[in-house]
């Protein structure tokens, strides 16, 4: 119980602003760890970069207009996903996607009619859940 974490209990974890700076291997290991250490019904809220509009799924593509800006700021982009593959990506790691929207959609829904500046469509927030034993991670 050190630090408040109890393995095997229903947990909610917020993993915001982290995924894009990790390697694919680190993202994979973290998701698998989360699914193995927490009880069914546990949820993971996370953000990620949607690569669908950029023409490539690797972290080395030149098509990301802000990639160099991030690198110069000491925050190199390493990982993103195409939105269409997120459900299968999570299912392979023992999780089920329950919600996935762009930050622009999330903010517009939460603050209708307000000037929100220019939130992006490619920065997304998602909710994944450890399915109950009777369910499968693919959505049963």
PLM features: residue spans?
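Alpha-helical subdomain
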Residues: 1-140
């Amino acid at each position: 119980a050190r630090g408040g974490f109890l393995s095997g209990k229903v947990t909610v974890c917020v993993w915001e602003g982290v995924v894009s700076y990790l390697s694919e291997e680190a993202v994979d290991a973290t998701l698998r760890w989360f699914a193995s250490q927490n009880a069914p019904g546990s949820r993971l809220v996370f953000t990620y970069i949607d690569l669908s509009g950029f023409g490539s799924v690797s972290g080395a593509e030149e098509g990301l207009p802000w990639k160099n800006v991030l690198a110069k700021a000491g925050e190199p982009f390493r990982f993103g996903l195409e939105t269409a593959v997120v459900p299968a990506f999570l299912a392979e790691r023992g999780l089920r996607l329950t919600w996935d929207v762009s930050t622009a959609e999330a903010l517009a829904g939460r603050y209708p009619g307000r000037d929100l500046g220019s939130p992006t469509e490619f920065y997304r927030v998602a909710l994944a859940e450890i399915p109950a034993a009777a369910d499968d991670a693919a959505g049963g």
